[in-house]
């Protein structure tokens, strides 16, 4: 019998019941909750007069609607304020731990989970948010769920799911200078497309993946959803264990030793068979920039905007034509000639300490270009912000003309005060460049933190390797 993939090991460890058609009731170890997808779920509990099955397995934090500027006056927008106040009230009523807006541990849910040791290897992790796949970086099975499923997990600590197919994305070799996990993610999506991972759980492996920090692995797994995958994951190794050790919610003493012994088994067996294998050469990956309105519309910084006539199908050709029209770009324009109005460094993809260090290294001693109206850096959590300030990164950004903000989802999505105006063009370290994602009529280009910082200082895209 062939060995098991990491996905199969994680899945099998959480099976409660299997229906004849394969639909499986899975046990959920960790439930992350935020203010946008939880109000209806809590309301459902109240109407049914149910209590959460395991309030200790849930943790809540407001992130989507919180202001990233001065918080002393609270939240100005009444709808956003109501959502956060509702989360506060629901968590208090049902006994769920919440890192409120005035708590230094508050931040983006997919940053605070790993940071606090709430995300551990071998866990099933869910959240009412697409980018829950981030937590798979720890050798966990993590995926986003809908609001009705949020209620189901609160009530039963279980969830009905169908098993995914398995894909191995193998990146061998060594990344070049200035090339990051974000570039790997965009290169993978450019290769397989935004539907390439549909129906799959993607495991990232190979020498280049093993060489990544946990921050890099989180970036990669965060973007797995943009390839259409249900989940992304990386096998546990010493890098994983070293990151988790000593975190507030991590096990200690004998429990730690027992956990580590199991965690070390969380990798695909040598003879495991995947449904699909995709291979990339790390040395061939260059800094990536998206040019269109889907993460698969991506090219290298040294290339030009493609011509729709080169699209692989008529459907794609029409998509490219529409994208270029929306983005206000002409085919053949060098990527390096694309000028910018705003730059956003943040989001659950790229707002961790390593991301901020990479951006600060580029910004140091430079100034934001005059044509860039706003360049902002939004740390992923209060603790990331605290650490960055202890390292002097905030001064580097402020001296260069960047705004240094409070933690939150910010300009990743047009759900708070940070957004693009119609026609504004932004270099963003977030994960989605859909039409209107950062604001109605806003034009988003996805890049790494270092590329975003370089673009802010140059006023247009530049190859960070030569900057």
Swiss-Prot record:
Cited InterPro entries: 3-IsopropMal_deHydase_lsu, Acnase/IPM_dHydase_lsu_aba_1/3, Acoase/IPM_deHydtase_lsu_aba, Aconitase_4Fe-4S_BS, Aconitase_4Fe-4S_dom, IPM_dehydratase_rel_enz, IPMI_cat
Matching Pfam families: Aconitase
UniProt cross-references to PROSITE patterns, sorted A to Z: ACONITASE_1, ACONITASE_2
GO MF, one annotated term: metal ion binding
Residues reported in the UniProt entry to bind [4Fe-4S] cluster: 348, 409, 412
Biological process according to GO: L-leucine biosynthetic process
Catalytic activity: (2R,3S)-3-isopropylmalate = (2S)-2-isopropylmalate
UniProt pathway: Amino-acid biosynthesis; L-leucine biosynthesis; L-leucine from 3-methyl-2-oxobutanoate: step 2/4
Cofactor binding, note field: Binds 1 [4Fe-4S] cluster per subunit.
EC code(s) of this entry: 4.2.1.33
Keywords carried by this UniProt record: 4Fe-4S, Amino-acid biosynthesis, Branched-chain amino acid biosynthesis, Iron, Iron-sulfur, Leucine biosynthesis, Lyase, Metal-binding
Domain of life of the source: Bacteria
Role summary: Catalyzes the isomerization between 2-isopropylmalate and 3-isopropylmalate, via the formation of 2-isopropylmaleate.
Protein family (similarity comment): Belongs to the aconitase/IPM isomerase family. LeuC type 1 subfamily.
PANTHER family: 3-ISOPROPYLMALATE DEHYDRATASE, HOMOACONITASE, MITOCHONDRIAL-RELATED
NCBIfam families, per database record: leuC, PRK05478.1, PRK12466.1
Protein name as it appears in the record: 3-isopropylmalate dehydratase large subunit
Source organism phylogeny: Bacteria, Pseudomonadati, Pseudomonadota, Betaproteobacteria, Nitrosomonadales
């Amino acid at each position: 019998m062939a060995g098991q993939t990491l996905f199969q090991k994680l899945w099998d460890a959480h099976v409660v019941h299997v229906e004849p058609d394969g639909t499986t009731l899975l046990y959920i170890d960790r439930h992350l909750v935020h203010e946008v997808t939880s109000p209806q779920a809590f309301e459902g509990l109240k109407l049914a007069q149910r209590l959460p099955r395991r309030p200790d397995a849930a943790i809540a934090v407001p992130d989507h609607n919180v202001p990233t500027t001065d918080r002393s006056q609270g939240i100005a927008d009444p709808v956003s304020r109501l959502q956060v106040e509702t989360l506060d009230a629901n968590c208090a009523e049902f006994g769920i731990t919440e890192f409120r807006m005035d708590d230094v541990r508050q931040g983006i849910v997919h940053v605070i989970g790993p940071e606090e040791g709430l995300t551990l290897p071998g866990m099933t992790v869910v959240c009412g948010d697409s980018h829950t796949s981030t937590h798979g970086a720890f050798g966990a099975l993590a995926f986003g769920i809908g609001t009705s499923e949020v209620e189901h997990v609160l009530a039963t600590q279980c969830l009905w799911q169908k098993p995914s197919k398995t894909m191995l994305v193998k990146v061998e070799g060594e990344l070049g200078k200035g090339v990051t996990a974000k570039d790997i993610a965009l290169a993978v999506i450019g290769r397989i497309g935004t539907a390439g991972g549909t129906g799959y759980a993607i495991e990232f492996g190979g020498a280049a993946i093993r060489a990544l920090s946990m921050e890099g692995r989180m970036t990669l797994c965060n973007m797995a959803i943009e390839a259409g995958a249900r989940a992304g994951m990386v096998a546990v190794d010493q890098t994983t264990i070293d990151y988790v050790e000593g975190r507030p919610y991590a096990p200690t003493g004998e429990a730690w030793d027992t956990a580590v012994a199991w965690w070390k088994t969380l990798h695909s067996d040598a003879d495991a068979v995947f449904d699909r294998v995709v291979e990339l050469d790390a040395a061939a990956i260059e800094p990536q920039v998206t040019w269109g309105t889907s993460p698969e519309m991506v090219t290298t910084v040294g290339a030009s905007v493609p011509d729709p006539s080169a699209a692989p199908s008529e459907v794609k050709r029409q998509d490219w034509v529409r994208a270029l029209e929306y983005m206000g770009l002409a085919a053949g324009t060098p990527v390096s000639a694309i000028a910018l109005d705003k730059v956003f460094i943040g989001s659950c993809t790229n707002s961790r300490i390593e991301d901020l260090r990479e951006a600060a290294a580029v910004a140091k001693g430079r100034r934001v270009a005059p044509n860039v109206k706003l360049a902002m850096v939004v740390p992923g959590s209060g603790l990331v912000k605290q650490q960055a300030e202890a390292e002097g990164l905030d001064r580097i950004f402020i001296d260069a003309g960047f705004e240094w903000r409070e933690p939150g989802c910010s300009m990743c999505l047009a759900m708070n005060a940070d957004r693009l105006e119609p026609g504004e063009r932004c270099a963003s370290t977030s994960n989605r460049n859909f039409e209107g994602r950062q604001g109605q009529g806003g034009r988003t280009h996805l890049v790494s933190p270092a590329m975003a910082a370089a673009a802010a200082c140059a006023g247009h895209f530049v190859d960070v390797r030569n900057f």
